[in-house]
């Protein structure tokens, strides 16, 4: 999965990531697409790097909202979505 695909899948999440509130169903669909496409360690590390880059590039993202997003969508991502995450530690 490319960073462009990760960003495309998360485009509907920007409002929630910035302001909180209700997570749109289309956002959760994107989150689940990313998770389902991350089958190998290399995939998970690549997605992590893309998420880190996106978190740093989009203005106004609330770190607490980013951390809460997987749970709000009913999925478990085995690492924290944060600009400080060490993607190389992901298996």
Swiss-Prot record:
Keyword Transport part of the UniProt annotation: yes
| Sites where the protein binds a 1,2-diacyl-sn-glycero-3-phosphocholine | 44, 79
> Which InterPro entries does the UniProt entry name for this protein?
Bifun_inhib/LTP/seed_sf (IPR036312), Bifunc_inhib/LTP/seed_store (IPR016140), Plant_nsLTP (IPR000528)
**Which GO BP terms, alphabetically?**
defense response to fungus; defense response to Gram-positive bacterium; killing of cells of another organism; lipid transport
Tell me, what is one Gene Ontology molecular-function annotation carried by this entry? Answer: lipid binding
| SMART domains cross-referenced by the UniProt entry | AAI
Q: List the disulfide bonds.
A: 3-50, 13-27, 28-73, 48-87
Instruction: Point out the signal peptide segment.
Output: none
Subunit-level organization: Monomer.
Give the similarity note.
Answer: Belongs to the plant LTP family.
Protein name, please? Non-specific lipid-transfer protein 1
